[in-house]
Amino acid sequence: MAISATQVKDLREKTGAGIMDCKRALEDAGGDVNQAIAILKQQGLSKAEKKSGRAATDGLVEPYIHAGGRIGALVEVNCETDFVGRTSEFRTLAHDVAMQVAASSPKYVSEDQIPEDAWDGLIQEYGDRAKAIQAVCLLDQVFIKDGRRTIRDLVNDNIGKVGENIVVRRFARFELGADLPPAADEVTE
């Protein structure tokens, strides 16, 4: 089946993938755009797996201050080169991750950062291990802008687009007065 330039352009706009990748995916899918998107997503995941071992030492620290200035977040997102770190796609990813941190209050970047002695309390609070991971691990949280994807999916999609490893290294979340004891007049009996 002959794939038109319009089909390739449309798929590219939807996925951000390269021209030849879009053309190959459309050819493999017999012109079916939805199947081509699935193929590109799978390729993106395999690219992410291949690149995960590469050092990501460049990148940026992205701030996000929620309207009203009462909640804010800082995230460090790393990539392999300063070229990628300056792209609008990378900056958008970092901004979205910072917004996620401000909105969802994760405690850890990923499951491997959870201390062993914290598991009992987390399982008691959330009911089971999987729910606890989704609640407290940034990469496993459902993306606030798209409830069908996690932050890990968002990062992996960007790895596939830019062709470099991307790592969410760390974050800090600030909420005005969150760590202060209640004032004497706020204490109820």
Where is each model-derived feature located?
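N-terminal assembly/interaction segments in proteins that build large macromolecular machines
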Residues: 2-189
